[in-house]
Regions:
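Structural recognition of the beta-strand scaffold that forms the well-ordered cores
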Residues: 760, 770, 804, 847, ...
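Structural motif
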Residues: 216, 814-816, 843
């Protein structure tokens, strides 16, 4: 930028006393400051016109603030000062006390709930001991430089830290004995990082710039910068490139991905992004208010408007007259969510802002009792039901007890990794590698599954006590290259330079070829058995990854799809010859689905409960679980259920026909039993991780052994008594089915039963469409509609392959799809009970994903998009040498300019343009509050969100004891049902030990 091109970014104006009274940004919007005696700030009026005020006692250097507030009483605080103690009271009436000694070190904090936290310091004023209100004690020892050297957590486990002469952290040994190490050059720059598995990542510099990153397998990433130190090119180990270019102010102007697709950016004077042009031609435009909050967003498909309250809290989101509102208390803590139908979801908070009660859109109320550390120890549920929890000193759940005596117990190793999970059905034991914490053996009752890994952590072999022996091989870039089961079934993959599958070859002479467009989307998939084409599908795509049509080239069947402006898939038109069939999936304001465009074929209640359709009336219990699906008209093949019993046990009143499906639930929220219309029962059992272990029907029981989150073995045995005991604990070879999934995914690849080996072909969504035997014969062919319901099938038995949308297993006995933590009904397009993770994903707690052509719900938690593929980064932030946060970030959204942040000691830190937005947000907070902040990240090319979360999970677990608790930057995520402390064997980002609580808690404590 030349002098003639200079642009005013911020202007400052001062009064005659030297006090700054106004700042003006590049758009001409100003903040105003007013002062009292002694240069004391008394009023600040922000760009939106809202004012904040300060009142003081005393004058000059002795002046102290006694009252501060924003207009309308927002963020109001009163301060009282006494000898050795300061008291604060906020606008909600919550009072806290801070007691300090003669050195002005706080030694006791009395929080707003009356809990007392005590602190103890050494002679150098370093914090040595912290005891929380529950008596949990954490201790820290320091070296002569004041750096933590020994940290002992509340469970008594110790982490050891070692530093070099320049005070750089060089080694960390966790309580479980796992070791991480770091190397530095003479300038204090990180040159190598060694993980617990011994794999070393190296960093190379030229001058001041980082030029190369080389992983443990010798793969090198090369970085190029322009003369302004902007990253302009990244070369991947396989020769692919990503490019960035910038405007004259250093803002990102264009980004070109590895396939040559360009994304362009435009900005206003204040560097707000106002235009984004995607490679597919979709252009996004954005508008902002004076505070920099986005108030209007529009692209070629959607238009959304936002309004804001004090300090930028979101008050409403409106799209096509669909309005969601948010209400807050004076602390700006979320108290209410109003949905599009005018229903409210409300929260009650204690003095610390923790949720103590919540009332759903449907009026269901839950109350939460917490201990002094904030852990939920009791959930009071509707109908007098309750759940209790017990914890160790680090907040890990040890015991979950339900009101009916149902109990789950959990055990952890010294690093806080789950090693046992048991309930009345099954004990699961996880044997972990001492160095890495990876699960090497999982014992489930009398069976076990063992895993072996290569140096990169890729799983190379899976064996079981029931005879499974599955081997995986990977290519130079770490992508799955081949799988083999014993000496029989085999599959191999050929990929493009970005790692996307182009061809798969399976046993029986099966070849699956995939063609893609420049965005990596499938445009054609074909299946050949020998030289004969047995399957061929063609896909047409529109903007925003909307599938417009799918054609089965062999049958001539064409499916065309329509969408609304909310990204809902609303219509499927199927044409075959002269016949045309149309299926509707039309949502109302809150996402409830209808089968007609007029939306008069169904009736819904508050909170999205389906109450009636043309065939049935739906009855629910007091927790929102479906308990009776009653036929409107009597049926000859149905029995009448006992009306008194239904009212007594299920709370069903005024039934019409007494005929239909009855659903019974465990106290933990899992489906326990289904009574069919013919009076026969289907019963289910689960382990402590929510995995189904047994299904009993007509004197036979189906058993499963799991490999993490996917079933590995399945067999059927005869029941010999009323307790469901089987005639044999182990199946013979001919009755045992072994399922093989593509490693690290939920996509089935093969079925082995006895000597019969079958290859499974799936579409671009991972939904099985065909199956072939070892001779290359097509034995199973299935087509689903937009609800996931089977519309066309050819083969011996539909149940030969029971998998539908990813993560779903169809039960022929009930017609339901088991979806890990819930059951999905493809007839109506929704789940039987509410989402265990509540509002985390979406306000519709019964609904499936809005677009089944694009999104997945793998474990029954609404709208998982874990299969999305993108370039991503795993990052870590350390504060004062201690891990603050591990996280993942997609490189799809990055900063457009260099961002300068000044730390408390006045040091300026630059967050360079091109930094992923998620990383930018974390660094901005860290730099603004701490002087000693270090940052590092590792790129991953074209990787799924699922896999990135798995990698993140493993990293956090290896480091979890550094602060003797969850790293503070990860605490919020750990409280979510999809939290970052996933057991790495499970693959999904779920802390299962927390999930059992979330089944009742609905994690509302995380919403605000």
């Amino acid at each position: 930028m030349t002098d003639a091109e200079e642009t005013l970014l911020v202007g400052y104006r001062y009064d005659g006393h030297g006090d700054m009274v106004q700042t003006t940004d590049a758009r001409g919007v100003s903040k105003h400051f007013e002062y009292g005696k002694g240069h004391l700030l008394t009023r600040l009026t922000n760009q939106g016109g809202m004012a904040f005020h300060w009142e003081y006692e005393g004058e000059g250097e002795n002046a102290r603030c006694v009252h501060t507030w924003g207009d309308g009483g927002v963020m109001e605080y009163f301060f009282e000062y006494a000898q050795g103690v300061t008291r604060t009271r906020n606008g909600e009436g919550a009072v806290s006390e801070y007691h300090y000694d003669s050195d002005r070190l706080i030694y006791k904090v009395v929080d707003a709930n009356g809990g007392i936290t005590r602190k103890q310091y050494n002679a150098y004023k370093e914090l040595e001991v912290t005891v929380d209100p529950e008596g949990n004690c954490r201790k820290t020892e320091y070296n002569r430089y004041g750096l933590p050297s020994v940290i002992t957590d509340a469970n008594g486990n110790t982490t050891l830290l070692t530093y070099d002469g320049d005070c750089n952290l060089t080694r960390m040994k966790t309580p479980g004995g796992r070791v991480l190490a770091w190397d530095y050059d003479t300038m204090g720059r990180l040159t190598a990082r060694t993980g617990p598995d011994g794999q070393k990542t190296r960093y190379g510099y030229e001058g001041k710039l980082l030029r190369t990153i080389t992983d443990g397998q010798g793969r090198t990433y090369r970085l190029t910068f322009d003369d302004r130190y902007n990253l302009t090119l990244m070369e991947y180990p396989n020769g692919l490139f990503r490019r960035w270019s910038y405007d004259r102010r250093g803002r990102l102007a264009e980004e070109v991905d590895v396939k040559g697709n360009a994304t362009r950016y435009g900005y206003d004077e204040a560097d707000n992004l106002i235009r984004l042009e995607e490679p597919d031609g979709n252009t996004h435009r954005f508008e902002y208010d004076a505070m920099g909050n986005m108030v209007h967003a529009q692209d070629g498909i959607r238009e959304v408007r936002f309004t804001y309250g004090a300090l930028g809290v979101l008050k409403s989101r409106e799209q096509e007259r669909h309005r969601i509102t948010f209400g807050y208390n004076s602390e700006l803590q979320l108290k209410r969510i109003g949905n599009e139908a005018g229903e409210d979801y409300r929260f009650e908070l204690d003095g610390l802002g923790q949720v103590t009660a919540e009332t759903g859109f449907d009026g269901i109320r839950r109350e939460y009792e917490r201990d002094g550390a904030g852990n939920v120890v009791r959930v009071a549920r509707p109908g007098g039901k309750w759940t209790r929890y017990e914890y160790d000193g680090e907040g890990n759940i040890l015991r979950e007890l339900q009101y009916d005596g149902e109990e789950s117990l959990y055990t952890y190793d010294k690093d806080g990794l789950l090693v046992k999970a048991g309930n009345g059905e099954c004990l699961t034991e996880l044997v972990r590698d001492r160095k890495t914490g990876r699960v090497t053996e999982e014992r489930q009752g009398g069976h076990s599954v063992r895993s072996e890994y290569d140096k990169e952590g890729n799983r190379t072999r899976v064996t079981s006590t029931l005879g499974a022996d599955i081997r995986h091989a990977y290519d130079r870039d770490g992508y799955l290259q081949s799988m083999q089961a014993g000496e029989g079934w085999k599959a191999s993959w050929m990929r493009d330079s970005a790692g996307l599958e182009m061809q798969r070859t399976c046993s029986g002479g099966i070849t699956v070829r995939t063609e893609r467009d420049r965005f990596g989307r499938e445009t054609r998939k074909s299946v050949r058995s020998g030289s004969i084409e047995r399957g061929a599908w063609k896909y047409e795509w529109g903007m925003a990854d909307r599938l417009l049509s799918k054609e089965n080239e062999l049958t001539g069947t064409v499916m065309r799809y329509d969408y609304d402006r909310f990204d809902f898939l609303i219509r499927q038109e199927t044409t075959k010859g002269s016949a045309t069939d149309v299926i509707y999936r039309v949502p109302d304001f809150v996402g409830n689905l209808y089968g007609t465009p007029e939306r008069k074929d169904r009736k819904y209640g508050a909170g999205g409960r389906l109450l009636e359709d043309a065939e049935c009336i739906y009855h629910y219990d007091d927790e929102g679980n479906l308990v009776f699906r009653e036929f409107r008209q009597p049926r000859e093949d149905a029995v009448r259920h006992d009306r008194r019993r239904m009212e007594r046990e299920y709370g069903i009143r005024r039934p019409v026909t007494d005929m239909g499906w009855i659903y019974e639930w465990t106290s933990g929220g899992m489906l326990r039993r289904v009574v069919r219309p013919d009076g026969r029962s289907v019963e289910f059992r689960y382990d402590a991780l929510g995995r189904r272990t047994a299904k009993q029907y007509l004197g036979k029981v189906t058993r499963w052994v799991w490999d993490g989150n996917t079933p590995l073995h399945e067999w059927v045995a005869a029941v010999t008594d009323n307790d469901g005991r089987e005639e044999a604990s182990c199946p013979d070879g001919n009755s045992l089915t072994t399922w093989i999934f593509e490693e690290g995914t939920f996509v089935p690849a093969a079925k082995i039963r006895g000597d019969r080996q079958c290859s499974i072909v799936s579409d671009y969504m991972g939904t099985p469409v065909q199956m072939y035997d070892s001779e290359g014969n097509r034995i199973w062919d299935c087509t689903l509609d937009i609800y996931g319901k089977v519309t066309d099938f050819r083969g011996e038995s539909l149940h030969d392959c029971p998998f539908r949308f990813q993560g779903q297993y169809e039960d022929v006995e009930t017609g339901l799809y088991y979806n890990r933590f819930r059951y999905y009904d493809a007839e109506i397009g929704c789940y039987l009970n509410q989402d265990p993770i509540g509002l985390t994903r979406r306000l519709s707690v019964y609904g499936y994903v809005c677009n089944s052509n694009l999104l997945l719900d793998i474990v029954g938690w609404h709208g998982n998009s874990l299969d999305n593929i993108a370039d991503s980064r795993l990052y870590e932030i350390k504060i004062n040498g201690i891990l603050f946060k591990y996280g993942i970030a997609t490189e799809k959204y990055v900063t457009k300019i260099d961002i300068t942040v000044v730390s408390p000691n006045g040091t300026s830190h630059i967050i360079p343009k091109g930094t992923p937005t998620r990383i930018k947000n974390q660094l901005r907070k860290a730099y603004a509050n701490y002087d000693d902040v270090t940052f590092d990240s590792q790129p991953y090319k074209q990787i799924s969100t699922f896999k990135m979360r798995e990698i993140e999970s493993k990293k956090i677990k290896a480091y979890v004891e550094l602060t003797q608790k969850v790293p503070s930057g990860n605490v919020d995520h750990a409280r979510r049902g999809y939290g970052v402390l996933a057991d790495d064997f499970s693959g999904v980002h779920d802390l299962i030990k927390d999930l059992k609580m979330k089944n009742n808690l609905h994690i509302s404590n995380d919403i605000h």
